Amino acid sequence: MVVGGTGVLCGRMAQALAEAGARTVIVGRDRAKGSAALERLRMDGCELTFEPCDVTSRDQLHDLVARVLASHGRIDVLVNGAGLNSATPFLEISDEELERMVAVNQLGVMRACQEFGRYLVERAESSGEGASIINVGSSSGLTPLSRVFTYSMAKAAVHNLTRNLAREWGPLGIRCNVLVPGFFPAEQNREILTPERVATIIGHTPLARFGDADELAGATLLLASDAGRFITGAELVVDGGFSAMTI
């Protein structure tokens, strides 16, 4: 399950899982974007389908779990990657914007972990089968970045939630990790990536470039598969060295 899989980054993560043999479901609000994502991502021999869902609705998430269990029989990997960004100056952030950003970036992840988690915990307790939850975080969830106040705040909460769940569900074999992208060209970043900001970011990145969506594939497969079976509660940073640099 790849929530937010209609976007560029999570779409590539979904494709990587499908290429590795997973029966993969991408999830998004927009059916047209879902159809376009399937056209873009489908490859011979890969099973990739779309399910509509708004992560701000608990009822829709509950129904999504039921539909996928009915169609696929089981759920083993959950990727939570739905997200919004905003560059509104701090003193100008309205209640409406704040609530929207938190609803998608923070509460959407929490609700998805709850709704899918009920199934995963029940299965683990009855059969001993584990699972992997990958919550997509952000470099701004580690160190606050300028101009993205609400986004940084919500992503920091996702990092904290994930570590809590790793502690809570680890004994059941349910691994919970944060995949932390650095700067990747994505639709939600267009408003904040001015030419001046791009130059600053590149100058602060040892590999001296933005990431490519393909470069999230390896980290996704590691966290999703038995290759990462002893990894839980981790923040796997894929940022070209951005977080390692000070001056």
Regions found by a protein language model. Name each.
Residues 143, 221, 232-247:
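Short C-terminal tail/terminal secondary-structure segment
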